[in-house]
Amino acid sequence: RTCNKTFSDQSKICPPGENICYTKTWCDAFCSQRGKRVELGCAATCPKVKAGVEIKCCSTDNCNKFQFGKPR
């Protein structure tokens, strides 16, 4: 499996056993100025959701793209 690890659509081959791509977003102290923090990566299972954190998981190559800004 390959998953996006950066915002420039650069994908990375996931380690063996990690077949899930994820996009994790959350707010920190600068959320109102900079927007949500974002983490892209691979996992063996979809990470557990914690309060204030959004996680989207998918299982096809490079399916975890993240688009900044609002659609026009």
UniProtKB/Swiss-Prot annotation:
Statement: the UniProt record of this protein carries the keyword Manganese: no
Additional detail: Negative results: does not affect alpha-3/beta-2 (CHRNA3/CHRNB2) and alpha-3/beta-4 (CHRNA3/CHRNB4) nAChRs at 1 uM concentrations.
Molecular functions (GO terms): acetylcholine receptor inhibitor activity; ion channel regulator activity; toxin activity
UniProt KW keywords: Acetylcholine receptor inhibiting toxin, Amidation, Disulfide bond, Ion channel impairing toxin, Neurotoxin, Postsynaptic neurotoxin, Secreted, Toxin
PROSITE patterns tied to this protein: SNAKE_TOXIN
One GO cellular component term noted in the UniProt record for this chain: extracellular region
Similarity-based family: Belongs to the three-finger toxin family. Long-chain subfamily. Type II alpha-neurotoxin sub-subfamily.
Role description: Binds with high affinity to muscular (IC(50)=114 nM) and neuronal (alpha-7/CHRNA7) (IC(50)=58 nM) nicotinic acetylcholine receptor (nAChR) and inhibits acetylcholine from binding to the receptor, thereby impairing neuromuscular and neuronal transmission. Competitive radioligand binding assays also demonstrate that this toxin competes with epibatidine binding to the Lymnaea stagnalis acetylcholine-binding protein (Ls-AChBP) (IC(50)=4.9 nM).
Modified sites of kind Arginine amide: 72
Compartments, record wording: Secreted
UniProt KW Disulfide bond keyword: yes
Tissue specificity of this protein: Expressed by the venom gland.
Record-annotated disulphide pairs: 3-21, 14-42, 27-31, 46-57, 58-63
Subunit structure: Monomer (predominant).
Pfam families noted in UniProt: Toxin_cobra-type
UniProt PTM comment: Amidation does not significantly affect toxin selectivity, since the activity profile and binding data are reminiscent of classical long-chain 3-finger toxins with a free carboxyl termini.
Record organism: Dendroaspis polylepis polylepis
Name of the protein in its database record: Alpha-elapitoxin-Dpp2d
